[in-house]
A protein has these predicted regions:
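Entry/N-cap segments of selected transmembrane alpha helices
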Residues: 84-114, 165-166, 219-222, 275, ...
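Membrane-embedded hairpin module used as a gating/binding unit in multi-pass transport
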Residues: 17-18, 169-262
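Structural signature of hydrophobic alpha-helical transmembrane segments
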Residues: 2-16, 62-75, 125-132, 240-252, ...
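Flexible hinge motifs at transmembrane-helix junctions and intramembrane kinks/re-entrant loops
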Residues: 24-40, 57, 61, 230-251, ...
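Hydrophobic transmembrane alpha-helices of secondary-active transporters
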Residues: 17, 44-51, 64-92, 251-260, ...
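Alpha-helical membrane segments and immediately flanking helix-loop junctions
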Residues: 116-160, 167, 179, 194-195, ...
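Juxtamembrane and boundary regions of transmembrane helices in multi-pass small-molecule transporters
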Residues: 115-122, 165-202, 313, 318-331, ...
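C-terminal ends of transmembrane helices
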Residues: 20-32, 78-90, 179-181, 255-270, ...
């Protein structure tokens, strides 16, 4: 029996899953203690349910996830509104260092995948199906490069890449919170938290205020930025390079924020925009999690499971020892480490959810919430595509 849910039913199920995750997180100490995001908790439970239904032949669920993209764009547009020139300048060196760490991670993931593939006596191109294509790249890059690998003779590469990306989405989400928690508590990093002043944040005194009458204006500002962003995205596509769909909206939002900030002609309602962005992130993750097809992981052969285990171990070691130490060994570095687990094995929204869960438990981290979406959204996909192209042609 095939059960098809339209976009309204899909987002309704996602909301129920979010509520379930929040309910369990509030009552299960282990989930709260390890900072597991609520959408992941409820989503994994639902994904296991749909997997059992599929395996036993009871039912196969089909979702219309078109609203997932809408929620993703709204969230990243809200992130774009947080960017301004002064903050970007203040994080200049940290931005370069963090970008270097991401580039190194891309290379490590691919070298590990190729090395393990040779040890297991399988094609290095099969190994690449579990490298940075699905890890840093996520499902989008997996879908783009799977057919390319098939053209190079890797049978079922699209399925393998998608399955690996599915695994990474779960592993990165589950790992991020515990990594951040362990670093913070083991090294007593709350003592290193510095409350940033207004001159660094470039926020007015009403940043943390919320006014019901201003939410419509905030929604309108988001919609305008998204509309302008579609034009920017079309212009970027003329370069022949592939960018995430939300990049144009992020750029438009950043421009609107800076024009408003420096001209004083209009106000950007950051408090309300942040709230709307948070809701959009939760809905995006909810839909992404319920549409996971866990049975794809069961179809992986033992060598591929070994490859994925290797990527998981690499991610833990890299974030815990390398990212944390290079980024300063402080609270911000710990939050960044939890974020890298998210977009290093899945997607930037998962990174944001990991960091959000950690910061809700401990303290805010302006630095982490600036660097991760900036590098993860603007640079990682582009650099990853270049690296993947090199590795495919080199092999």
């Amino acid at each position: 029996m095939k059960i098809q849910l339209d976009m309204y039913q899909t987002i309704a199920v996602a909301v129920v899953v979010l509520m379930l995750g929040k309910f369990l997180k509030e009552r299960v100490e282990l989930l709260e203690r390890f900072c597991i995001p609520a959408p992941v908790i409820g989503g994994v439970i639902f994904a296991i349910f749909t997997c059992l239904c599929y395996v036993t032949g009871i039912a196969e669920f089909s979702f219309d996830d078109i609203l997932k993209e809408v929620c993703m764009v709204f969230f990243f547009t809200s992130v774009g509104f947080q960017a301004n020139l002064k903050v970007l300048k203040s994080g200049g060196r940290a931005l370069i260092v963090f970008l270097g760490l991401v580039i190194t991670l891309i290379l490590c993931q691919n070298f590990l995948a190729i090395g393990l593939a040779k040890l297991l006596h399988i094609s290095p191109l099969v190994g690449l199906c579990t490298g940075s294509i699905p890890m840093i790249g996520g499902n989008g890059t997996a879908g783009a490069f799977g057919p390319v690998l098939e053209d190079f003779g890797v049978k079922g590469a699209s399925t393998l890449c998608t399955a690996a990306a599915t695994f990474g989405l779960i592993a990165g989400s589950v790992m991020g919170g515990p990594v951040g928690k362990r670093l913070i508590e083991k090294k007593n990093l709350l003592d290193t938290v510095v409350v940033e002043d207004d001159s660094l944040l470039i926020e007015d005194e009403r940043k943390h205020e919320r006014h019901a009458s201003m939410y419509p204006a905030a929604v309108f500002q988001l919609i305008i930025a998204i509309g302008i962003g579609t034009i920017i995205s079309k212009l970027l596509s003329l370069t022949g390079m592939t960018f995430p769909i939300y990049i144009g909206a992020m750029i438009a939002a950043a421009c609107m924020r800076n024009i408003g900030e420096y001209s004083g002609k209009f106000t950007i309602y950051m408090g309300e925009i942040n709230d709307i962005g948070g809701i959009s992130l939760s809905l995006f993750l909810g839909i992404a999690m319920i549409t996971l097809k866990l049975w794809q992981l069961a179809d992986l052969a033992l060598p591929l499971i070994t490859l994925l285990a290797g990527q998981t171990i690499l991610m833990f070691l890299y974030t815990y020892f390398v990212v944390f130490n290079v980024m300063g060994r402080d609270y911000d570095a710990a939050v960044l480490s939890s974020g890298v687990c998210g977009f290093g094995m899945g997607a930037t929204p998962n990174a944001m959810a990991n960091m959000q869960a950690v910061c809700e438990k401990y303290a805010p981290s302006v630095k982490a919430f600036l660097l991760v979406p900036l590098v993860g959204s603007l640079f990682a996909d582009f650099l990853n595509s270049l690296a993947i192209t090199f590795f495919i042609n080199f092999l």
